[in-house]
Amino acid sequence: MKEFLNWSKRCVVVCILLVFCFFWGSTAYAVEILMGNEGMLVFEPCEITIAVGDTVTFRNNELPPHNMMVSDHPEYSHSDLAFAPGESFDVTFDKAGDYRFQCDPHAGAGMIGGIHVE
C-alpha cells in the first residue's frame, strides 16, 4: 500500500508539472490578415500586435492581385502576387520591432498596414 501511495504522489507531481508547462510554455500563435475585404482595397485588420515567433497568414480575400511588402525588411516581404481567392502565404516574425507593410499594386489606394512585434 505504501508503494502505491508513493507511485500516486509521483503521478500527481508529474500531472501538476504538465499543467504548468501547458499554461506557461512559450506558445507561438497564428494570426490571419485578409487582403481585400468587403469590396475595399484594405488589409483587415490593418494593425496588429503579436509576439516574437508568431506567424501571420495573409489571405487573398477579394479584388486581386495582392502582395505584402515590408519596408526595409525583405526577409518578411512576399513579392509574388496572390491572384486566386483564398490563396495565402505565411510570414513568421522572429525579431521584435514595428513593421510597416503595403500591397505594392494598391499602396496608392491606401492598402497599407502595420505589425508590432513584442
Residue ranges and their predicted role:
Residues K2-R10, C15, C21-E118:
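Extracytoplasmic copper-binding redox domains, predominantly the cupredoxin/blue-copper superfamily
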